[in-house]
Amino acid sequence: MKTVFIFLITGFEEIEALGIIDVLRRGGVNVKSVSLTDSKQVVGSHQISVTADLMFGEIDFTQAEMLILPGGTTKFKEHDDMKKEVLAFANKGEKVAA
């Protein structure tokens, strides 16, 4: 089953990430949150700790339907492996939201 992956990194905007996850799951979409830190526990911009479903290394990008990067921080640009995968995904014409 195709999956929507939403990336979480320290300082992410909680409402942008959790609101999207909630709406997609209510709609029956397979969505997984992905930690870009060294732990599944990720702290957002308002000090709310969230437990991600997966670590970045666990993703099978061939199963991705869409990639989402919530706002709140510029730290996403520091994660080189994620940037590489997102660019490759976008260059294939796949859906990326930020």
PLM feature spans:
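Extended, subdomain-level signal for the structured scaffold at the beginning of enzyme domains
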Residues: 1-96
